[in-house]
């Protein structure tokens, strides 16, 4: 699984851990990715999407089995 958002292309960034003694170690800041069943390129697929794209509404989630059924009120 690549650590990249399929919607916005957000990838890991490189930064530093800095201690009180100012010892510096390299580290990676990974995006908060979630595997979501969504409509992507006209198909329902599981894609890795960052939470900022989910919150912004850039992802169209796939309909579940219960959605879309019409029940009669008789």
Curated annotation (Swiss-Prot):
Any single Pfam family the record assigns to this protein: Ribosomal_L28
Protein name (record): Large ribosomal subunit protein bL28
InterPro entries: Bacterial_rp_bL28, Ribosomal_bL28, Ribosomal_bL28/bL31-like_sf, Ribosomal_bL28_bact-type, Ribosomal_bL28_sf
Listed NCBIfam families: L28 (TIGR00009)
Alphabetic keyword roster: Ribonucleoprotein, Ribosomal protein
PANTHER family the record matches: 50S RIBOSOMAL PROTEIN L28 (PTHR39080), LARGE RIBOSOMAL SUBUNIT PROTEIN BL28A (PTHR39080:SF1)
Family named by the database record: Belongs to the bacterial ribosomal protein bL28 family.
Record's GO cellular component terms: ribonucleoprotein complex; ribosome
